[in-house]
């Protein structure tokens, strides 16, 4: 399964083509739209989330509520485009452009992208580098999550800590309803209240905040990924996908950085066996991956999200046209997008997992894949 996205932040729409989905996957807009809604929620978001009401539209590959085996085409319209139609006009002659951006923003793609592609209006960088693109990747991830759900896999994204505040209530699958209702997708109401206070303070001061996001999956079969080739190792693929999220600057599988400061005897998960459970672990400090493959334990992917780079009290920069000192450009932005980023991490991790399932089990139809997964589960139980 592979996919491609297109579209700009203030263009008419976002687009995606997904190739390699099996025929017979039940799929409707209601499998995708709730994930788009989750991405738009979260305390600390900006006015753009008031304007947009993201809804997916199928353009190809789905008929009668099921995939046909052909490429699936998705679209999400940008409601804000009506306010930018003249500025984003693709027709020749639309130069010099209105609202040209020449003051590169520190922490953004503006300067490096401008130098790479020769743009003096940095809007040509900003529009595609924007995190708005992740709306479509969440839609693709929702399709992957639907496929995984039919294979017995469940995923969730949440926030273990942000704005310098750590949740003291550890994650539990029983807390998923609480996470879904939380404005910050946190497990701990007290930590949440303090984080909200800090978000309000940062907003009043024209500043931004980052945090830690985590995606968890249960129900995975062991053996997804491979130890044979470096590019098939699942932890590497998950890390690349996580680091492709705008503002994510670090990733770990399980408590990797904590593990790095301990002895091996304190870190590695002992192996046990019983007739009822087969092989299992009493701990999961590996985060569900060993040797580039799933172990069958819960998969834990954690990432660090830096504070958003667009500041209402901008940092010093230089104008790329005049080379004169200037304050960085200000665009409408969020104070924090950490809760939304946890949803994005879950969706994007699901894409990697769906790809791994399809690579291992193949099949042109969903029914074939389900049968092969069940036979594999039986073989693993008998191992």
Swiss-Prot record:
Regions annotated as coiled coil:
none
A UniProt-annotated Pfam family:
Chorismate_synt
* Cofactor (UniProt): FMNH2
MF annotations from Gene Ontology: chorismate synthase activity; FMN binding
Q: Where does NADP(+) bind?
A: 39, 45
Q: Which HAMAP family match?
A: Chorismate_synth
> Function of this protein?
This reaction introduces a second double bond into the aromatic ring system.
Protein name per Swiss-Prot or TrEMBL: Chorismate synthase
Gene this chain is encoded by = aroC
